[in-house]
């Protein structure tokens, strides 16, 4: 009998050992499946992140292109306005110079008119030595002088 009890014990140990092995195999397979699923989710998450970043890069490239185009257009407008301003400044200088010349002429004519009244009909310029004509101080003739363009000869500009 002794032999039968020891045989039963060893078969029980083998059976329990076999069920433990089976249980360990199941756990191992379950862990492998879980790890595979986790790795698959991780790959999908990385792929989604990569797709999102690629979309963001494309969006930023498009936005950058729009900004560069806008800056280029703005630069062109700036250069156009700067050129127009340069022309207007030159015209302003020219008109200021013309105004100063006209004011000088008026001042000269006014001083000549005042001197004529004081000199009793003689010209204020002693070098001329001629009697002053009312042509230069007559208001009707003044409009003729004022409407003439001011021109400088090329010799007058050389020092």
UniProtKB/Swiss-Prot annotation:
SUPFAM superfamilies: Leucine zipper domain
Gene Ontology CC: one annotated term: nucleus
Main location (coarse class): nucleus
Biased composition (Low complexity): 1-21
Stored InterPro entries: bZIP (IPR004827), bZIP_plant_GBF1 (IPR045314), bZIP_sf (IPR046347)
One of the protein's GO biological processes: positive regulation of DNA-templated transcription
Any one Gene Ontology molecular-function term assigned to this protein's record: protein heterodimerization activity
UniProt xrefs under CDD domains: bZIP_plant_GBF1
Domain of life: Eukaryota
Domain bZIP: 25-88
Tissues and organs where the protein is expressed, per its UniProt entry: Highly expressed in stems and flowers. Expressed in root tips, cotyledons, leaf vasculature, embryos, apical parts of siliques and funiculi.
Induction description: By light. Induced by hypoosmolarity. Repressed by sucrose (at protein level).
Region (Basic motif): 27-48
Pfam families, per database record: bZIP_1
Region of interest called Disordered, as start-end residue ranges on this chain: 1-47
Protein localization: Nucleus
Keywords: DNA-binding, Nucleus, Stress response, Transcription, Transcription regulation
Region Leucine-zipper: start-end pairs: 53-67
Subunit structure: Forms heterodimers with BZIP1, BZIP9, BZIP10, BZIP25 and BZIP63. Interacts with ADA2B.
PANTHER family: BZIP TRANSCRIPTION FACTOR 11, BZIP TRANSCRIPTION FACTOR 44
Function field: Transcription factor that binds to the DNA sequence 5'-ACTCAT-3' in target gene promoters. Promotes POX1/PRODH1 expression in response to hypoosmolarity stress. Positively regulates the expression of ASN1 and POX2/PRODH2 genes, which are involved in amino acid metabolism. Regulates several metabolic pathways such as myo-inositol, raffinose and trehalose. Regulates several trehalose metabolism genes, including TRE1, TPP5 and TPP6. Mediates recruitment of the histone acetylation machinery to activate auxin-induced transcription.
Protein name: bZIP transcription factor 11
Naturally occurring in which organism (per UniProt): Arabidopsis thaliana (Mouse-ear cress)
